[in-house]
A protein has these predicted regions:
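Short coil/turn segments at secondary-structure boundaries
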Residues: 1-3, 8-14, 156-160, 177-182, ...
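ATPase catalytic-site recognition across NTP-hydrolyzing enzymes
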Residues: 1-39
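Intrinsically disordered or highly flexible coil/loop and linker segments, enriched in small
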Residues: 4, 45, 88-95, 154, ...
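Acidic two-metal-ion nuclease catalytic site recognized across multiple nuclease folds
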Residues: 4-6, 20, 184-204
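Short, conserved, surface-exposed binding loops centered on an aromatic residue
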Residues: 21-27, 41-45, 84-93
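Gly/Thr-rich phosphate-binding beta-strand-loop-beta motif of the actin/hexokinase/Hsp70
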Residues: 25-56, 180
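Mg2+-dependent endonuclease catalytic cores in nucleic-acid-processing enzymes, primarily RNase H-like
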Residues: 50, 57-172
Length: 204
């Protein structure tokens, strides 16, 4: 059946897109945050897993969706892909994730433990933050509505699967990308905005 837009939480007209050519993520004012929704044990089919990367600008507070990697894959590949993203960030931007969130509900704690082991073995020491998602998913994702509506979160037109999931939530067949974006946004918002201090006031 066709989805009625009025039943959905996010209006596509709210999506603000950034131009990759105009944003320099190498700038040190950007901090990188990641989140994985592995979808282990959620359904019989273990649908899509989602790895979201946000770049948060320390001064403006805006959050840019750098990467929205949503696909079907086994746990070993999820872990490998996360570590590759960390390596890519270090190689291309000179620094890795400030924080990386992983859901630890049900079977998903297993993936977090294996990710930590693999990360240490690779010498990457990913800064993993456990996120025990216990609240109602739809209500949790609904809290992201003002951030989308006010353009605090900036999207990339390349991320078609994420945008489609956003547009259809909560009526769509898949929501792993939306769930991971909400988790990533929550971790990024916990990191307070950067303030320029007057050294004179500190007696420096």
């Amino acid at each position: 059946e066709p989805i009625n837009p009025e039943d959905c939480i996010f209006n596509p007209e709210w999506f603000e897109f950034y131009n990759e050519a105009e944003i320099d993520f190498k700038n040190r004012d950007f901090l990188f945050f990641g989140f994985v929704d592995p979808s282990l044990g959620k359904t019989k089919h273990s649908d899509f897993s989602a790895i979201i990367t946000l770049a948060k600008h320390k001064v403006s507070g805006y959050m840019y969706v750098m990467d929205a990697d949503i696909e079907r894959r086994h746990p070993d590949k999820i872990i490998g892909d996360i570590l590759e993203k960390e390596k890519m960030l270090r190689r291309d931007y000179g620094r890795g994730y400030k924080k990386f969130g992983a859901e630890t509900v049900q079977f998903q704690w297993f993936l977090k433990e294996e990710l930590a082991k693999a990360s240490a073995k690779a010498g990457l020491y990913l800064p993993i933050e456990e996120v025990p998602q216990t609240s109602d998913k739809t209500m949790r994702i609904q809290t992201m509505q003002p951030d989308v509506k006010n353009h605090y979160i900036k999207f990339n037109k390349r991320h078609k699967r994420l945008l489609e999931q956003m547009e259809h939530f909560p009526m769509g067949a898949h929501d792993d990308g939306v769930d991971a974006l909400e988790g990533c946004r929550t971790i990024a918002k916990k990191m307070k905005r950067f303030r320029v201090l007057d050294k004179g006031k500190l007696g420096l």
